[in-house]
Amino acid sequence: MESLLHASSSLVSLRPRIDGRDSFINPSRVCLNPSLGRRGSKPLPLVAAAKKKKSKKDDNHNFSARPDEATGPFPESILLKEKKIDEEGDLLPEFADAEEKELYQFLDLQLQSDLNEERMRHYEVVYLIHEKHAEEVESINQKVQDYLKEKKGKVWRFSDWGMRRLAYKIQKAENAHYILMNFEIEAKYLNEFKGLLDSDERVIRHLVMKRDEAITEDCPPPPEFHSVRAGDEYYDDDEEEEIEEDEDEGEGEDEEDADNIEYEVDDDGNVVMVLYGDEEEGEEEEDGASEQEEGQDKSTNGRRETRRTVNVGG
């Protein structure tokens, strides 16, 4: 009996103390050492709950609106606002006022100029369309502009001078449709652009010139060649046609005449034109002596020499 009382008192003295601060621990879950219990009882694990530490960071989240925060439904003016797109299909930014827009355009132009300074070049082209393809002028112009747009080029000026009379016939055409255009494109595409005009049989002539800057002002067509020549009292339209017909025949004769003319400088500093001609047959015998004296100055082909003094720069 005394042994039982002694054992019960020892168990009571070993119960854990639970004060008010740790009152959240459940005493029923605290198990004692099995060596202090009855003999033959199963060992029980000791389980204790840990105290959670509170975060010292303050939570400033608040559902109330700040003074500078907009409230209410989303403005329909922003949802339904029409967006503007430029010529190249890019979305234009929104500007607060005209001054901000002007500043943006200036900075964008300066940036593009710096980036494309070494790649982009300005050119001017004049091309003539055959008169029998007068109805296809618009399609030809569209073809050229589409090519420039494909190569990221830009057209600065486009002038349609219409049908004009040619100074001379080209591919049996007396008139042609004139087009003047200033454009900007990378230098590596210039030969390809010229090939585009060369491959089109409707374009009978074209001329491409390099420019230092973009030209945008309108350029009126110059007066026609025949209207200018009409004021010349010595101008004859029929005579010009005859000259054009005999132009090919006269080219060979001019070349032969040029071969028979030479220029020399005499002792006095005068320029002497020496004209060589074929030696005539049937010359008189009385001139034989003079011919022998002049024979020293003749060329080996037996041509006659005629000298004439020509004033140069006088």
Curated annotation (Swiss-Prot):
Ranges of Basic and acidic residues composition bias in the record: 56-69, 295-308
Tissue specificity comment: Expressed ubiquitously in roots, leaves, stems, flower buds, flowers and siliques.
Q: Name one GO biological process term.
A: root meristem specification
Where in the sequence is the transit peptide found? 1-47
Keywords of the record, alphabetical order, are: Chloroplast, Developmental protein, Elongation factor, Plastid, Protein biosynthesis, RNA-binding, rRNA-binding, Transit peptide
Record's family? Belongs to the bacterial ribosomal protein bS6 family.
The record, for HAMAP family, names: Ribosomal_bS6
Where, per UniProt, does this protein localize? Answer: Plastid, Chloroplast; Plastid
- What is the name of the protein in this document? Protein REGULATOR OF FATTY ACID COMPOSITION 3, chloroplastic
Q: What Gene Ontology cellular-component terms does the record carry?
A: chloroplast; plastid; ribosome
Q: Does the keyword Transferase apply?
A: no
- Give the observed phenotype of the deletion mutant: Decreased leaf photosynthetic activity, reduced accumulation of plastid rRNAs (both mature and immature) in roots and altered root plastid gene expression leading to small plants with pale-green leaves. Abnormal intracellular distribution of plastids. Altered fatty acid composition of membrane lipids leading to an increased oleic acid (18:1) level at the expense of alpha-linolenic acid (18:3) level among total fatty acids, especially in root tissues.
Which region ranges are annotated with the description Disordered? 49-73, 214-314
Please name the source species: Arabidopsis thaliana (Mouse-ear cress)
What function does the entry list?
Prevents non-specific action of the splicing factor CFM3b during plastid rRNA biogenesis to improve the accuracy of plastid rRNA processing. Required for plastid functions such as photosynthesis, intracellular distribution, plastid rRNAs biosynthesis and plastid gene expression in roots. Involved in a sucrose-conditional process important for the organization of root lateral and apical meristems (e.g. establishment of RAM from pericycle and symplasmic connectivity), and subsequent primary and lateral roots development. Modulates C18 unsaturated fatty acid metabolism.
Among PANTHER family, the record links this protein to:
MITOCHONDRIAL 28S RIBOSOMAL PROTEIN S6, SMALL RIBOSOMAL SUBUNIT PROTEIN BS6M
Q: Which gene encodes it?
A: RFC3
Keyword hit for Chloroplast: yes
Listed under subunit, the entry gives:
Interacts with CFM3B/SPRT2 in plastids.
GO molecular function terms listed in the Swiss-Prot or TrEMBL record? rRNA binding; structural constituent of ribosome; translation elongation factor activity
Name the Pfam families for this protein: Ribosomal_S6
Q: Please give the positions of the paired cysteines in each disulfide bond.
A: none
Acidic residues bias located where?
233-269, 277-294
